[in-house]
C-alpha cells in the first residue's frame, strides 16, 4: 500500500489517539504526545462528520481536563493546530487552551 506522507501522518495520529483513548478509559493520565493526538483526532473526525470549524474549535476545548493529563502537560499545550478536511475543503483549526 502506497500512502502519501500526509496519509501516514494521519494514521500515526489515529494510532496514538486510539492508545490515548484506551488509557483514558483505564483511568490513566495522558502524556504530551497522547494528549495532542487525542485532541487532533477528535477534531479530524468531527470535520469528517460534517461539523464546522467554529464547532471544532469549541469542541476541542471540552475534550480533556487537567485531571486527565500528567502534571505540567496543560501548560505545555497552549494551543493545538490541526489541518482537517471539512465538507468545503481542508482548513486549519486552532484550539486555544485546549486543556481546562
Curated annotation (Swiss-Prot):
Pfam families per UniProt: Urease_gamma (PF00547)
GO terms of biological process kind: urea catabolic process
Primary subcellular site in the record, as a coarse category: cytoplasm
EC number: 3.5.1.5
Catalytic activity: urea + 2 H2O + H(+) = hydrogencarbonate + 2 NH4(+)
MF GO annotations: nickel cation binding; urease activity
EC main group: hydrolase
Classification via SUPFAM superfamilies: Urease, gamma-subunit
Positions in coiled-coil regions: none
GO cellular component: a single term: cytoplasm
Subcellular location: Cytoplasm
Stretch forming the signal peptide: none
Subunit structure: Heterotrimer of UreA (gamma), UreB (beta) and UreC (alpha) subunits. Three heterotrimers associate to form the active enzyme.
Family membership: Belongs to the urease gamma subunit family.
UniProt name for this protein: Urease subunit gamma
Organism: Psychromonas ingrahamii (strain DSM 17664 / CCUG 51855 / 37)
Amino acid at each position: 500500500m502506497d500512502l502519501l506522507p500526509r496519509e501516514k501522518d494521519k494514521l500515526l495520529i489515529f494510532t496514538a489517539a486510539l492508545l490515548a483513548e484506551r488509557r483514558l478509559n483505564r483511568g490513566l493520565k495522558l502524556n504530551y504526545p497522547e494528549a495532542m493526538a487525542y485532541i487532533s483526532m477528535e477534531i479530524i473526525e468531527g470535520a469528517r462528520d460534517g461539523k464546522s470549524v467554529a464547532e471544532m474549535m469549541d469542541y476541542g476545548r471540552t475534550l480533556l481536563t487537567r485531571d486527565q493529563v500528567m502534571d505540567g502537560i496543560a501548560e505545555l499545550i497552549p494551543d493545538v493546530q490541526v489541518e482537517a478536511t471539512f465538507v468545503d475543503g481542508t482548513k486549519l483549526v486552532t484550539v486555544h487552551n485546549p486543556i481546562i
